[in-house]
Amino acid sequence: RNFKVPFVKLGTFVLLLLILGILASWIFPDFNSLNSNALNTLKLGFSLILVGIPIYLLLEIYYNPDTIIKINDTLAYFTLLLERFILPKSVRKEVLALLGDVKGKKVLEFGCSVGTLTLNLAESVKPNGKVYATDLSEKELVITKKRITKRGHLHVVVIHDEHQVNRVHPSIPHVNAVVSIGMMGYMQDVKKILKEMRELLPYGGKIVFVDYADFFKMIPNVAWLSNDRVIEKIFREAGFSVFVQRKKGLFWNYVYVYGIKFHENIPYV
């Protein structure tokens, strides 16, 4: 229950003065002399804080849906500026190759970001195909819409879904293929999302997922993405036969998961 704490402002001020006083007496024990060891320890402490802040933010981005949306919105134009670095042309080519011929087909792009891959997909499905591009960041979708409108891609449907970490947007119709970049680590209910995707696909319909792993070689991966067999098992239980491959990058590695919707538990060849 709620309750009032007496002397909140005054108590905070007094406590702050007390802490500063202790620090001062530690660094300047005799007022005229400087304790170099204390100063070095203090510098080390501040350096650890400076290192810890970005690590904390990266962990928040990994695990907290609200933080994911806020960060993605804030960094939308920064993402656009660095899109060739974040999603290199070589990775895009591999994704399109794994997806195969989608000319005239319907493709769901689950997590389109600023439209980096969306533009390639829009060209690939021409002349009679359609791309459904969803994302949880409104600001990133504003950028995506501007880019596809500028190129006259009227066959691309852009959909904002703030609950994308837990579902496939209910307005998505049946599609021929699903592609997703950088979304597996954000999924809060992986099995539910995969089963919803399965319902939208025909038997033999392809899926291609790519995600980032070993961020800056120091950020821990989402647990289920750390083990290839676990990934295969989760996808198999959802009705997909998949391959899992890992490829090295400069600041992170890439996890490729690709395969098909199947009738029975048969290998994807």
Where would I find each of the regions flagged by the language model?
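Core SAM-dependent methyltransferase catalytic element
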Residues: 247-269
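A short acidic, Gly/Pro-enriched loop at the edge of an enzyme's catalytic core
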Residues: 168-178
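A short glycine-rich, Lys/Arg-flanked "PGG" loop and its adjoining helix->strand segment in the class I
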Residues: 191-203
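Conserved alpha-helix/loop element of class I SAM-dependent methyltransferases that forms part
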Residues: 86-103
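A short SAM/SAH-binding and catalytic strip from SAM-dependent methyltransferases
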Residues: 176-189
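Conserved beta-strand signature within the Rossmann-like core of class I S-adenosyl-L-methionine
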Residues: 204-212
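Class I SAM-dependent methyltransferase SAM/SAH-binding core
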Residues: 108, 120-165
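C-terminal membrane-solvent junction of multi-pass transporters and transport-like membrane proteins
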Residues: 1-31
